[in-house]
């Protein structure tokens, strides 16, 4: 990310800039592959978890976890703001992107997102309290190769927003 700050050693605050997104082809017919992505590279099996709090303003404002092998193979999961509502969302990309989304019945201040990689499978969960986790997606991701794992944000249509990760 261009503008970010680490507070109290455990909180990352980033300004998500306008005109950013991660999406490949599909029936929408466009590809965008740029946005803030703060990551470390891991191999083998792992679990990644983050608490996300967004100041969502415009439709498609989004933030969460990203697991990325390269520009054609990646997963992003988190909250996406659509038509004034928060949604838990996952996009899985293997050459083309797909999108699964479930509207939340309210607007929680924060959501926890967790990704668990076992061999060539990734399970994605969300939680409202960091205690009870609900599975939102299971998908394939090539095993035996390094994966960039980290925090992402995107603002395709708005002027940007502030994203907080813990």
Q: How would you describe each model-predicted region?
A:
Residues 1-166:
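Extracellular glycan-recognition regions
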């Amino acid at each position: 990310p261009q503008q970010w700050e680490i507070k109290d050693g455990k909180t990352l605050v980033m300004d998500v800039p306008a005109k950013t997104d991660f999406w490949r082809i599909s029936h929408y017919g466009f590809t965008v592959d740029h946005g803030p992505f703060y990551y470390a590279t891991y191999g083998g099996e792992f679990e990644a978890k983050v608490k996300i709090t967004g100041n969502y303003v415009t439709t498609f404002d989004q933030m969460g976890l990203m697991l990325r092998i390269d520009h054609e193979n990646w997963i992003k999961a988190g909250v996406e703001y659509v038509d004034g509502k928060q949604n838990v969302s996952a996009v899985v990309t293997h050459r083309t992107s797909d999108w699964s989304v479930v509207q939340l019945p309210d607007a929680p201040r924060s959501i926890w997102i967790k990704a668990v990689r076992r061999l060539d499978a990734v399970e994605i969960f969300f939680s409202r309290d960091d205690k009870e986790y609900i599975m939102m997606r299971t998908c394939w991701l090539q095993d035996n190769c390094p994966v960039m794992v980290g925090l992402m944000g995107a603002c395709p249509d708005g002027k940007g927003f502030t994203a907080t990760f813990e």
